[in-house]
Amino acid sequence: MNIFILDSWLREHLQTKATPKQIGEYLSLCSQSVEKVTKIEDDWLYEIEITTNRPDCLSVYGLARELAVILPRFGLPAKLKSLEISQPVKTPDKKNLPLEVKIKDASLCPRFTAVIFDKVVIKPSPKIIQERLEKSGIRALNNVVDISNYLMLELGQPMHTFDYDKIKGAKMILRESAGGEKITTLDDQIRPLPDGTIIIEDGEGRIIDLCGIMGGKNSEVDEKTKKVLLFVQTYDPVRIRQACQKLAFRTEAASRFEKGVDPEGVLIAMGKAMEMFEKNCEAEIASQLIDIYPNPPQEKKVKLDINLVNKIMGIEISKKEIVNILESLGFVLETNQSSLMTVTVPHWRYDDISIPEDLIEEIARIYGYHRLPTNLPPMAVVSQNKIDFPKWEAKIKTALKFWGFTETVNYSMVSESILKNVEIKPEECLRIANPLSDEWVFLRPSLVPSLLQVASLNKKENLKIFELANVYLFQSENQLPEENLMLTGLVSGESFAKVKGVVESLLEELGIKEIEIKPYQLQKTFYGKIFHPSRRAEIIFKNNSLGIFGQLKKEKVFVFDLDFTQIVKDTNEIKKYQAIPKYPPIIEDLSFVIPEKTYVGEIMKAIKTTSLIIQRVELIDSFEDSRTFRVTYQDTKKTLTDEEVEKIRNKIIKGLKDKLKIQLKS
């Protein structure tokens, strides 16, 4: 996530003489990546990419806190200024507007604070606030809304304001949404609420807030507002993230809440907001401060061994320097004479620091990754042949392109209906925990459903398409899914023999010859269900299955589904030179009457193995129970005589009759 902050705003919290260029360079070296430092009039604007695990840096103050530690490591004095709140959080003496708050599940909202202001004057914010918001990428609206956005950028604490008079019954109930509920948000969008979304309803049951994401239109602050309810809180990050994913909608506030907001910083932000309301809105505090904080987090302690620090960093770093680095970052240390120490984590890092390695990462980045030695760790080098997958992918794609195929690229996710169309059980597939929509719920276990969907949208004769991509196979609850790279093609308007020829030619292109085509017998599998029972086959090479091809049951569409990883393992780049034969071949066609359930592959194999003189066997015609094979005879040492060919022919006829009960057609 990228944020934009002004140099002048940063220096309100950081006392230093470092230049903007130095700040950008050293912050990038030891903490967050500064993408750009841009001169804007008499100021500088930083564009900073904040890593997901560091929500404490999603604010001006958080970055100032980081820089106060980092800059002195480069010889640049820096000091973090204390957060001063001139007006402490207090309650009014006379006026006390009522507000009833009920939180149905404390885990939804770990900390809830609220206060009401009266006699609010709605007007534009001071110029400096407007400029800082606009240059940080947030539109200035009015003094009330701008306060919440301003403090979100400055302190990293999102907050929300309501028109108090629009909250019916002066009552707020924070709960999870139920099925079928909707809210009209501040952007005038009607949003159906997924089950389990955190919401707030008022005394009449109207939903007035899509918590952590955007407020409701029915409680917004407008130019007529006189009483404002300020609401500063934290939420369960997981619930906010899930809601954003299901709604396909995310705001600046949600981007912070879903990463985790420090509940200990809520009162600081509330105090700062109360001060700004009195100053910028001429408002009076008109209620008691509500602070619901039932389960404050327990103090987090992590054991750290200095020997482990040195082992992982690969250098000897003194105990004194380790202590100095960690204390400068806000950690509290309990040390003794041994190498062990107990480290108490500061509240703003509770979600980030859990194990000794987290602390070592902190030590390493402040010490300076650029100062660590670049020696490679000792290891045994094992020589192995690495398969060049991109090369073979390019080779296969080029071959298919020249044969008239078009490559398709489909989503890896499919819907339940697409799976059921090809008789794949959804419960046997990998379900995505947080799908983007109902159309993308499962990771596909095969490329076939995707290609069939493409074919249904492209109704035409002689369609030839293919896809080379991963499929994901569910194993068991205790095993990781299996990920396979598959090559799948779809052909319409052709014959079984031609599709078989494509598969054989493709494998020959990769140096895989003498494959065995066997009937596919597994009826209960996915392939057994979608393919025609007598027009499907399995490709075997060296006792390994390379894939399946066949005709679909319901229409004249052929599919081949090949295990690309296994194919590449069997590829052979070595091409043997074969001299052009000196002696001519003899070619003849033999027609046979074939009994039912006799496979052509068996016949061709029987013919080919009859004699070494037989160089090639092809099926050239098929009609009812008759098959015609073209047999090529050739001797590399002499010209064959008719008598020699006749002898081999008779041997073929006898062998087929004895083994397969096949008769020569008269």
Name each model-derived stretch.
Residues M1-F389, G493, E516, D563, ...:
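RNA/tRNA-interacting regions in translation and RNA-turnover enzymes
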Residues F4, I40-D42, L108-R111, F402, ...:
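Short flexible coil/turn linkers enriched for glycine and charged/polar residues
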Residues F4-D7, E12, K21, E25, ...:
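A carboxyl-terminal module marker
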Residues S28-K36, L97-K102, I213-M214, L289-D291, ...:
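Short amphipathic beta-strand starts and helix->beta connectors
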Residues E154-P158, R175-E176, E181-K182, S450-S456, ...:
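Long, charge-dense accessory insertions within large macromolecular proteins
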Residues M172-V221, R371-E483, L487, S545-L546, ...:
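Class II aminoacyl-tRNA synthetase-like tRNA-binding/catalytic domains
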Residues E264-E282, V454-K459, L463-F466, E646-I652:
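His/Asp/Glu-rich mid-to-C-terminal helical/loop segments that flank catalytic regions of hydrolases
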Residues N295-N307, P346-E357, S383-E393, K420-E428, ...:
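Short glycine/threonine-rich loop-to-helix capping motif typified by GTGT followed
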